[in-house]
Amino acid sequence: MVGRVQPDRKQLPLVLLRLLCLLPTGLPVRSVDFNRGTDNITVRQGDTAILRCVVEDKNSKVAWLNRSGIIFAGHDKWSLDPRVELEKRHALEYSLRIQKVDVYDEGSYTCSVQTQHEPKTSQVYLIVQVPPKISNISSDVTVNEGSNVTLVCMANGRPEPVITWRHLTPLGREFEGEEEYLEILGITREQSGKYECKAANEVSSADVKQVKVTVNYPPTITESKSNEATTGRQASLKCEASAVPAPDFEWYRDDTRINSANGLEIKSTEGQSSLTVTNVTEEHYGNYTCVAANKLGVTNASLVLFRPGSVRGINGSISLAVPLWLLAASLFCLLSKC
């Protein structure tokens, strides 16, 4: 705030006498030119504000005041603020320059002129605009599918910033309004990803920040591929599953868990697994089960390794015919990393 300096007590009588001459004692008129009311000057935070005041003749006695007190009386500076100075581009100008304007400078300023005829005042109201700035936003969050999620984005600025939320996907929905909170009820896996908060006003470019929302859900088999193979050749069965966290895989032949050994090799990466028979024999033909599990659930698919030309009893479609005890045992084993 543009403040004022307290005069030395020894000089107080002289100061008071000078102010009596400088400042009007009667009712003020509207402005120096008699035709305008209070002028509004709009300046962005950090810029320089120039509050114009032009007198009628060189003999006029002028002072600048604001709600805090006297800023300038004639050419004597009363304010302690180093950002404030007079601007006189010609003899009749008595403008006030405020550098690096901040929000606390906002308010009414008065140029008071004492002429030979009557006192006059010109008022200027300084409006300080502030670019939008996000001050608080939710941290990245992980929730289970079906949960309710509330994201928070708070911003400062003048005028008040408009908050806009957007889901950053190709078909991402945009949530517009001045709401600081974005509520997602019963969140689904499709609603996972990054959410962008944009705070905007007319002062400058928008401030943008992001929140990542991770949605956990149980495994779903997305593809299971049976295969045919002749004896003596290599063959693979493949299984893919979607889940968050990524699923762990196990393979079974009948009710027996399969390990990578004796010509069988299991390879699993995030979201997919394959069982490879390096040298197919008659005993390898038949039904196999791919089990995918994470901490939220377990699912399975049945696949077949069959002889060329034979009728496919199972074509690789998802099946739930596996005994419940096997699914329960698989889930327990996967979660305990047995």
From Swiss-Prot:
Family: Belongs to the immunoglobulin superfamily. IgLON family.
InterPro entries per record: Ig-like_dom (IPR007110), Ig-like_dom_sf (IPR036179), Ig-like_fold (IPR013783), Ig_I-set (IPR013098), Ig_sub (IPR003599), Ig_sub2 (IPR003598), IgLON_domain (IPR050876)
PROSITE patterns assigned: IG_LIKE (PS50835)
Function (record text): Mediates selective neuronal growth and axon targeting. Contributes to the guidance of developing axons and remodeling of mature circuits in the limbic system. Essential for normal growth of the hippocampal mossy fiber projection.
Residues bearing PTM Phosphotyrosine: 94
The species this protein was found in: Rattus norvegicus (Rat)
Propiece residues: 316-338
Main location: membrane
Name of the gene encoding the protein in the UniProt record: Lsamp
Signal peptide: 1-28
Name of this protein: Limbic system-associated membrane protein
